Amino acid sequence: MPYIKEIIKYLEGGNNPFYYYIFTFFSAITLRNFVEFMIVSNAHAIQWHHPVHFSLFYISLCLSIIILLYLITREKVERIARVVAASFIITPIVPAIDLLLQVVWDYEIKYQYMIPEKTESILKNYLLFFGNHAGATPGIRFEIFIAMICCSFYVFYKTSSLLKSLLGAILFYSLVFWGYFAILFSIQGIERLAGLLYDTSPKTMIDTYLFLAIHAFLLVLYFYNRAYMTAVVRDIRLTRILHYEMMVIFGFALGYPDSGRFFMSLSNIMEIYFVVLSVVFAFIFSAITNNIADVTIDKISNPDRPSVTGVIPWETYNIIGFTALFFSIVYSLTAGHMILFLIICFIGVYFLYSMPPLRMKRIPFFSKGFIALNSLIMLLAGYSFHGKEITSFPPTVAVFVLICFTACSNLIDIKDYEGDKAAGIKTLPVILGLKQSKMIIGIFFAVGYASFPYIMKMPDLYAPSIIFGIALLLAINIQPYKDKIVFSLYLLSSISLLGYLIAKNINK
């Protein structure tokens, strides 16, 4: 027992940089994949998606184990992560043991466990994992057994509780079995309940593990530092993200009527979810870079932002931003190369708008064309989700979006009037004065809403559109100005009009 404590202390110690443990983890699982590919009987069938699929499996599993051990021990997440990441060095043992036994017993190695079509009873497999039944190879069983013992020792070392130690081993095994070994049963069950096609293709498996990995990762980050996560979430500018997400859904609805494609499998659902997720991450990156450039202005207009309060150190704040950028690119790529291209365009346009050296937001009025362009890009992202070419997007709608949102996006400068004025940024409110600019921007909204039914060729929307436009005109000019009320009314009106459009298109 003492030597186990020494191993844990060594792995938890801060003498080695954390990225050493990350590289150790990836080196271990890469070695596992390499050895497995070399010895399996159907190695000739290995394709590009196999290492991707398997690596994502291990990444999501590693994160899930960290969460489990944190909930049981309440140890610091970073310490747990160091131990768990290094512990994956046992994974290459599996193919090594199976290869040795193959030489002795001459049996065929096949890593095909818990296949729905070949599994008699999932509960029996769970209860008799170490028993005499077809499924996991001896190497896998040995690996799980060793991992359960290690988990039990770690929990006991941290809690000094035999009960928690036993519970930790059982919960670890249950997590691995029900959360990962039985994943095909979960996919099959969800697809049956939703009336979707049964699909366990490599794309579905990759999407599934990406889904598990990102949510586990975010939960690990939350447990690591709640203050950082809370600060980022509070500064997420929810109303603006919702605007862009609605543009994606609007584009999806525009592309639906003559595409004939809808959600046919679980993978289709996850693809559109990943588009939504990539937009969120792209906006987080853009918001963080904008905050870094706007510290002087935000000290006056937005003193509660993390860049002003200092709740997150600058170095960490930058890391969070580029991590969000990384996830935005990864998850947009899963939805297709066109989505990836459009997300990169979205990020680039926002960078040109808010960041030096160009910092185009300093150009009065017309700089909002960058925001309008990003709105159009999100429309195209939803539209192209159906596999349609963006060149077939209705040109009248594209022109309407560019003109209307260029004019209406000046709304965001009302709240920042004092900060922009102090910083010498010539926005419409700074040039014309707050009262006059609010009236002009309100008129932009009223005209835009009144024009929407004409552009969309939906005359039955004239009455509600005009009502919403007038309501926004009044809300913008109410004293004192309430940013949340205006954006809430905008989102409510947009959701209502969008809901009508979707319902009409689906019923065609």
Protein language model annotation of sequence segments:
Residues M1-K508:
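Multi-pass alpha-helical membrane architecture of UbiA-family
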